[in-house]
Amino acid sequence: MSLDPAIAAKLKRNDAGLFSAVAQEKSTGDVLMVAWMDDEALARTLETRKGTYYSRSRQQYWVKGETSGHTQYVHEVRLDCDGDSVLLIVDQEGAACHTGTHTCFDTDVLLAAEQ
């Protein structure tokens, strides 16, 4: 698969050719996770509507839930104003975090909401 050249032209990548991808749950608005994508991962996501990312440590693509069953159905993909990050609006089945929690952002609260 290859990414539409019009979309590719809008992306700003880091030195490794990657950009960040934020997954947000459609029904709750919860931010679920942040991962990396490159053009191929984005093209696969747009084609299949499955959250597809690039693993920097394994140097390979991975589809969310492919081994765990905790899948992401992608409803929308939005590009941020700088072109260096995408937002995926998803339906999350099961845990989004590899630790087994719903979101990767529920472990350490560094600043709590004021009461």
Swiss-Prot record:
Q: Where in or outside the cell?
A: Cytoplasm
The record's top EC class is hydrolase
- Name the positions where Mg(2+) binds: D80, D82, D84
Q: Which cofactor does the UniProt annotation name? A: Mg(2+); Zn(2+)
Keyword list, A-Z: Amino-acid biosynthesis, Cytoplasm, Histidine biosynthesis, Hydrolase, Magnesium, Metal-binding, Zinc
Catalysed reactions, as listed in the record: 1-(5-phospho-beta-D-ribosyl)-5'-AMP + H2O = 1-(5-phospho-beta-D-ribosyl)-5-[(5-phospho-beta-D-ribosylamino)methylideneamino]imidazole-4-carboxamide
RNA-binding recorded as keyword: no
Q: Which pathway is this protein engaged in?
A: Amino-acid biosynthesis; L-histidine biosynthesis; L-histidine from 5-phospho-alpha-D-ribose 1-diphosphate: step 3/9
SUPFAM superfamilies, alphabetically? HisI-like
Q: Which residues bind Zn(2+)?
A: C81, C97, C104
Q: Name one GO biological process term.
A: L-histidine biosynthetic process
List the molecular function annotations (GO) for this entry: magnesium ion binding; phosphoribosyl-AMP cyclohydrolase activity; zinc ion binding
Q: Which GO terms describe its cellular component?
A: cytoplasm
Asked whether the UniProt record includes Zinc among its keywords, one would answer yes
Q: How is the cofactor bound?
A: Binds 1 Mg(2+) ion per subunit. Binds 1 zinc ion per subunit.
Question: According to its UniProt record, what is one Pfam family this protein matches?
Answer: PRA-CH
State the oligomer form and interacting partners: Homodimer.
Q: State the function annotated in the UniProt record.
A: Catalyzes the hydrolysis of the adenine ring of phosphoribosyl-AMP.
Family per similarity comment: Belongs to the PRA-CH family.
Name used for this protein in its record: Phosphoribosyl-AMP cyclohydrolase
Lineage of the species this protein comes from: Bacteria, Bacillati, Actinomycetota, Actinomycetes, Mycobacteriales
